[in-house]
């Protein structure tokens, strides 16, 4: 599926290479219950989506600028909104730390195969994500992610969140080749597919629920190395 013009392949992290081991809403509800919140998992799920969307609106209004402090602040706000009644000063640090540990995450079985296959072809591989410096710990903790170590483009460190062009400019610099020869793979239509293509990169959307497939849409990560 990857044509001969491609020289580098970068991946989104959460929802592409990394997935929460248990539903985020369940983890939040369990942590919240220890700190004064009595909301159900379903209530947390709805409140989390709404809180996350509000933070996206705020980030867009700020031109997608970010840093380590902003990422921590946005997640503190999300936790407070998703867990009404909880003592957020007590609850937030535990959740922040939990999601920095490999115990909170799982890497799908095909990730090792795909990353190794691409690296063996001589392609530059890396990860580029809206995340913070906790991602380094996660990448270092999973043997499956070894091929992307040393090429981590993280929004809080480059100063811009996807879908900002500046984020993808930093990705291209890390790739070390022309932007038209960089392929970006992710699961979000606006941030990953549209953001990358608007910046002049090639892009593929990972969409397990896709009814139809095409050159820019796959259901499984291993489809990248098929054919």
Protein language model regions, located:
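Asp-based, Mg2+/Mn2+-dependent phosphohydrolase catalytic module
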Residues: 1-9, 19, 88-92, 106, ...
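N-terminal helical cap/lid subdomain that shapes the substrate entry/recognition surface
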Residues: 2-113, 121
């Amino acid at each position: 599926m990857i044509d001969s013009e491609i020289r580098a392949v970068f991946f989104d992290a959460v929802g592409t290479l990394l997935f929460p081991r248990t539903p985020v809403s369940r983890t939040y509800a369990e942590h919240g219950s220890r700190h004064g919140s009595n909301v159900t998992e379903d209530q947390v799920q709805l409140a989390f989506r709404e809180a996350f969307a509000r933070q996206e609106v705020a980030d867009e209004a700020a031109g997608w600028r970010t840093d380590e402090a902003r990422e921590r602040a946005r997640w503190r706000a999300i936790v407070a909104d998703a867990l009404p009644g909880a003592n957020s000063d007590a609850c937030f640090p535990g959740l922040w730390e939990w999601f920095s540990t490999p115990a909170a995450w799982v890497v799908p079985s095909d990730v090792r195969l795909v990353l190794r296959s691409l690296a063996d072809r001589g392609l530059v591989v890396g990860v580029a994500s809206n995340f913070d410096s906790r991602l380094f710990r996660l990448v270092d903790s999973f043997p499956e992610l070894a091929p992307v170590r040393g090429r981590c483009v993280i929004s809080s460190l480059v100063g811009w969140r996807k879908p900002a062009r500046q984020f993808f400019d930093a990705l291209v610099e890390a790739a070390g080749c022309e932007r038209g020869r960089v392929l970006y793979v992710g699961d979000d239509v606006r941030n990953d597919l549209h953001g990358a293509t608007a910046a002049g990169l090639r892009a593929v959307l990972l969409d397990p629920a896709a009814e139809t497939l095409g050159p820019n849409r796959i259901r499984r990560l291993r489809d990248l190395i098929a054919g």
